[in-house]
Amino acid sequence: MGIMYLTRRSAMGLLAGAIPAARRAAAQPATGLEIQKGPFVGTRDSLKAYRVPEWFRDAKFGIWAHWGPQSAPEQGDWYARKMYIEGDPAYKWHQQHFGPQSKVGFKDVIPTFKGEKFDPEHLMDLYQKAGAKYFFSMGVHHDNFDMWNSRHTRWNAVNMGPKKDIVGLFRHAALKRGMKFGVSEHLWISYKWFGVSHDSDKTGPYAGVPYDGNDPQNFDLYHDLPKDYPAQFSWDDKGIPDSWKRHWFDRIKDLVDNYQPDILYTDGALPFEEYGLNLVAHLYNDSARRHGGKVEAVYTSKLKEDCAEGTCVLDFERGLADAIAPNPWQTDTCVGSWHYQRDIKYKSPKTVIDMLVDIVSRNGNLLLNFPLPGSGALDDRELAILAEITKWMAVNSEGIYATRPWKIFGEGPGTKVKGTGRFNENGRQDLTAEDVRFTTKGKTLYAFLMGWPAKEAVVAPLAAKGKLEVGKIRNVELLGHKGKLKWTQDEAGLKVEMPEEKPSDHAVTLKVALG
């Protein structure tokens, strides 16, 4: 069958329309979905009572490790799909290094995923030093390969590849350091995403020869698709049978039960309505069981409608909210490609730090992915970025952790660039000395100067008789600077004479004591 090629961005763009439309259709009740008893049942009305735990609001910064069999070729994200799309660079690379897809498919890539340099304890030390308060492990990507000791599929990291319980090892390392632990599931769409593996070349010496996804021996990896399955790939649950929905529920429930994540991330909207709602209720109820009746777990969805009235945390992939959101939210983004890609351009440390401050000022958290290569060891450029974040957080993290938004998130040219939700980060420029961002903690206001001022910093929103009614300022400090500052507050704003040496690269933080 001919399969249409969608990019990740265009596929995710279908979420806003397709999923709500599907949900308006009356769903038949799913039977036999056993969940932990507790305060929630698997309905939207019940889940409206959910409230985001304070630890998540305080944490602000998490690190994610996209890692799995697709990391082994080191050719970037969606390799297991793109390698079956004739003409795609991944298709060509696969033929050059493995052979024709009709003979050597993704199943044959999996044994090359060794993780021979994987050291979760060392990695977690680096992540913690960089200031991450929570860590995310890949649970299962669209490639249908579980990174834990799964009892629902032989295609898992304990049975093949590195032959280790990757989720379990990451969890142990994170919890030992007092970090919260999250897992991501991208499984729900795998049924459609892997449809290309059932195709064949249109041209060349193997034209018409079916790819290895057509072999019944491989259906437990590539899925047993009907011969008349729709050729067009769409990011929704149309055409996905109830048997797969139930399998998804059982498999992710197994992940939740055995690894008790503090955060569960779905790549997309909450899947399969009643199946998904019951899974979220199970996650929350099990958390309440383990925490004396208090729900400490978090579930994230990328669909605004899922999170409008409690239920879960809204996640923006490679984007951010336009303004201060009333409820906590999260940006998930990457220093480069989601899965490891050789020689790709990475975000600079300044870009990453700008994003963190900007996001926190709007009531959000940043989840930053450092993709691991197949070996399981970070590359030198990733280590350099982590080192810069570590240095910056050592000076400025007081203005990040456990803070809340102020009356406005900021001032300056960067505030005029709209957030607009998902996939907008490429249109944003690094912030400059003309930009300021704000956070608060009690009677302390933190003003982040996003670039180093020449001599004097002027923070206009902190004017003595301005519209924001700041009131009288009692004291001003510069985080990381031991000396006293000369400052005044008048109708033009807060004016601070800056020292000759800046206490940190990138953004610097004024600690303002309000009256």
What would you call each of these model-derived segments?
Residues G17-A30:
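Bacterial Sec-dependent signal peptides at the C-terminal "C-region" and cleavage site
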Residues Y5-L6, P20-A21, E54-R57:
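Short alpha-helical segments used as structural interaction elements across diverse proteins
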Residues G2-G17:
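N-terminal secretory signal peptides and thylakoid transit peptides that target proteins
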